[in-house]
Amino acid sequence: MNEHLAFAQCLQRVLNETELTATEVARRLEMRSRNSIFRILKGKTSPQLNRRFLENFHKHMGEQLTEAQWAALNRALEMDAVGAVEYKSRQALMQLVGAFSEPISPAKVCYLDALGAEKEDSFLHYLQVLFCGALKVNALLFGCCDLGLFRQLQEAIHPVAQRVIVRIDHFIYAGEDEIVSNLVGIQPMVDQPCYHAYLVDAENCPQERLAHYRTGQMTFHVMHQDGSESTVALFLLGKNEFTATVMSTQDLWMSRKVLCDRERFSPIRLLWQLNDENSDFIVYTQQYCKMEHGAAIYYIRPDVPFQYIPLEVLYPVVREGFARMGMTREAYEPNVTALAEIHQARMTNMMRRRRPTYIVLNKAAMEEFVRTGRQSDHLHFLRNFTPKERKQILDVLVQQARKNPFFHLYFAQEKLPCTMGEVALYDGRALITMSSGSGYDLRTDHRESCITHPFVLRAYKQFYMNTVVARLADTQTESLNQLEELVRRCEKMIREGQKGNAGNEQEKLSGQ
């Protein structure tokens, strides 16, 4: 969990680290009075004045500080300008879309061993020991929403997932000062089958238990292979530091009560319960068709969305896919017909609705699609699209970008990778994240993070327009030019393929 300091505090820390005095800095910067820098250190100056000071500081003493120290000062300055809550939310959303990654410091756990001696271990190794020899682990989490912790939690669970039954219930406070960074912090675990998260709304939570939900705590109840059971609670003391306490059965009364609250709170992801894969996929696409209808949509994704593939291209390929799976035409045709109707409705909605659609794509991923005919989330039973089909798909995007005033297409700059998967905001309805490579295979317990909290939706929309579109993407004109270049590559591949086919025919005639 990374610390956020005001500019005055950050500057004082940097001066202490570099053993520079305020007097020395004032002299080197030729400031009229030492009082000016003392006012900055006391936090009595505006962000604008602090910005001018920092630029002058860098100009005259740039070599005195490390890159990390300059970065910390700039972050502190930005936080002062926009406020701590908005800054933390913005940084969290930058992490969500893959445009920013803070260094993660390993967490540690302090505990008493069997002899009562104080011990210290890394958070990751402590969990690995906890899971070793376990048959079943039930975990109850309150707060602790941090990317570093959750990456380590994922790393601890992954090796034992096949032999240990793990269930994690996580209660997350949904206050506006925490909700955005909290939901980003849990992303490493949100698509894991064992993980179940709930948003705790103060209005729907018993007041006597609300304080409990806001603590930083992880409780693990372990059933061991020898038949014994044990429970340990980790309490977050401060930055990246837990203390561990062994709990008795009597201590678990609050845990049992909070589990009863699960029905009060909204889960933050979709879970596709499978009865039949094909019919469930129809329900899945129907839900998206309904969510897209009449909504402004803000996409970030690697390449062409499934729903933007023209029906005349997609459904011959779908039929081929079902046939290759061994299904008869009589078996698959009802599903194909139902999917075709929904897909056409989605295409029509995209082209005709008078609400804006923004889509930011990754150029390298689009180039890969042109080369291979395969999307990052290619439907798992489909063959790759041919060069001709690829051109037809891109032609739809070009036509929309040229002629539809409500359709806005961008290519991301390098600082926005767009390779982690899809992040899609359906304005006022939901913010959905999905990892690349799922193939929409619902048999694999397909999951997507689905956030409906109004504050998060508003914060993400503002972030998308003010940061993603304004600062992290090429202009629409530049992006359209790049898209048209990809179309020309498809045309070249088609011509080269035709020449190759003509050459093969000539060889056959010569052989005769």
Residue positions per predicted region:
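DNA-recognition alpha helix
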Residues: 24-30, 58-62
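Extended, compositionally biased accessory segments flanking or bridging domains
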Residues: 93-136
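Recognition helix of helix-turn-helix/homeodomain-like DNA-binding domains
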Residues: 30-49, 73
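A short, Lys/Arg-rich alpha-helix, primarily the initiator
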Residues: 1-22, 27-28
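Hydrophobic protein-protein interaction segments
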Residues: 118-473
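Short amphipathic recognition helices of helix-turn-helix/homeodomain-type DNA-binding modules
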Residues: 1-4, 8, 49-107
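Cationic-aromatic interfacial patches
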Residues: 2, 13, 31, 221, ...
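Charge-biased C-terminal accessory regions appended to nucleic-acid-, cytoskeletal NTPase
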Residues: 459-512
